[in-house]
Amino acid sequence: MALLTALAVGAGGAAGAVARYAVGLSVGRRAVDTGLVNVFGSLLFGVAIGADFGGAPAVAVTVGFCGAFTTFSSFAVETVRLAEDGQRLAAAGNAVGTLAAALLAVFLGIALGAAL
């Protein structure tokens, strides 16, 4: 990885983390602010992919900013790409499987946390 690319990811990640924190402070309702950042992050990731500007700016936005701002954007892009590639069953499986796994992980995490 080139130094410029690594710095771009770091700068994007710092900006994404601060933006996520700011949204949480300003909205103040967890389900609402999470939904907002997930939808906006997906939109931004899609714009970056669609624009295909490549290089350090692309990874600053996608891996850095969106990665820190939300992880949902990557999931959404991957699912859409599967569907666009004609892999509709895989896209549906990815969507349902990821959501089910995430919900199960939260449930198990809560249970494990309560047991400590």
Swiss-Prot record:
Na(+) binds at residues 67, 70. The chain crosses the membrane at residues 3-23, 43-63, 96-116. It catalyses: fluoride(in) = fluoride(out). It is found in: Cell membrane. Keywords: Cell membrane, Ion channel, Ion transport, Membrane, Metal-binding, Sodium, Transmembrane, Transmembrane helix, Transport. It is a multi-pass membrane protein. One of its GO terms (biological process) is cellular detoxification of fluoride. Pfam families: CRCB (PF02537). Na(+) is not transported, but it plays an essential structural role and its presence is essential for fluoride channel function. This is Fluoride-specific ion channel FluC 2. The gene is fluC2.
